[in-house]
């Protein structure tokens, strides 16, 4: 989360080229949307017992259990030629990139339409319980959940692509209690890459094919680069925020303001 925000801030400040990043989580964690209250929507005691970290995202949306997955993040200026200026347009382009990448894996995905399903109130805090418009479905089941943040002419969108999904563990940390009905509902709502392809692939190979999907849809060459010195410095400062319970639990504001380049 600190790296995502550091890249986002530096892109806004220095008008950098778009960045696409893929990463995983260790140990397992639950990320919560910017506006969520984990004291009401998570089983914090169970998270602590299982060694599952809790971190608040800069983006909105609902709770996501991060375990065996690939998280992608895209950072760019609003109006950058590769992406439409509006939120839904940006979502769709990024989803098209992911659809193409999944196709290279042999996974046929499509975009969800608006209001295609009624939200289950018992599972309302769980991101994968229902798709939003332009999110990815495989055979009607959600395989990727995404959220976006915009400020000062830039956007950050990140999302989770499931490799496998442990329904029992996910519900045990997201819900105060769960029933067999909850488990069945969530299991029937979720798809995972290594469960829908004939032969599971190494994570690095999956990332390479997803990257190819972005390159082909956007018509660009993607060049691998390390973090800049400015991003590293900012990431180190932001780590204090993302390790702080006042941010993760209470959403206390951090002291590093967003700013444009002068």
Region locations from a protein language model:
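Short connector loops at helix/strand junctions that flank enzyme active sites
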Residues: 25-27, 49, 65-69, 131, ...
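Short glycine-rich loop/turn motifs that provide flexible caps or phosphate-binding loops at active sites
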Residues: 32, 50, 59-60, 139, ...
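Short, electropositive, low-hydrophobicity segments enriched in small/polar residues
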Residues: 37, 64-65, 149
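Catalytic beta-strand/loop module used to bind and position nucleotide/cofactor moieties
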Residues: 78, 82-213, 245, 249-262
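Well-ordered beta-strand positions
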Residues: 23-24, 64-65, 137, 162
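Active-site loop/lid in soluble adenylation, ligation, and acyl-transfer enzymes
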Residues: 1-45, 49, 53-57, 127, ...
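A glycine-rich, hydrophobic loop/mini-helix early in the fold
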Residues: 44-83, 209
């Amino acid at each position: 989360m600190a790296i995502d925000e550091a890249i986002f801030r530096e892109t806004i400040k220095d008008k950098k080229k778009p960045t696409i990043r893929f990463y995983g989580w260790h140990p397992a964690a639950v990320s919560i949307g910017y506006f969520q209250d984990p004291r009401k929507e998570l089983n914090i005691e169970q998270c602590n017992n299982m060694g599952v970290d809790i971190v608040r995202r800069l983006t909105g949306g609902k709770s996501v259990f991060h375990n065996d997955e690939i998280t992608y993040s895209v950072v760019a200026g609003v109006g950058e030629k590769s992406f439409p200026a509006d939120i839904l347009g940006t979502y769709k382009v990024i989803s098209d990139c992911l659809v193409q990448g999944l196709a290279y894996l042999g996974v046929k995905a499509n975009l969800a339409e608006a209001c295609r399903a009624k939200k289950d109130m018992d599972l309302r805090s769980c991101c994968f319980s229902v798709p939003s418009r332009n999110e990815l479905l495989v055979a009607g089941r959600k395989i990727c959940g995404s959220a976006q943040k915009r400020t000062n002419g830039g956007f950050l969108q990140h999302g989770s692509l499931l490799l496998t999904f442990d329904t029992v563990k996910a519900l045990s940390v997201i819900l105060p209690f769960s029933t067999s009905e909850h488990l069945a509902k969530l299991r029937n709502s979720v798809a995972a890459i290594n469960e829908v392809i004939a032969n599971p692939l190494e994570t690095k190979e999956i990332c390479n094919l997803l990257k190819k999907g972005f390159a082909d849809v956007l018509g660009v060459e993607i060049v691998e680069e390390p973090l800049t010195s400015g991003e590293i410095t900012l990431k180190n400062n932001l780590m204090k925020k993302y390790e702080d319970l006042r941010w993760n639990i209470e959403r206390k504001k951090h002291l590093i303001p967003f700013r444009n380049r002068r």
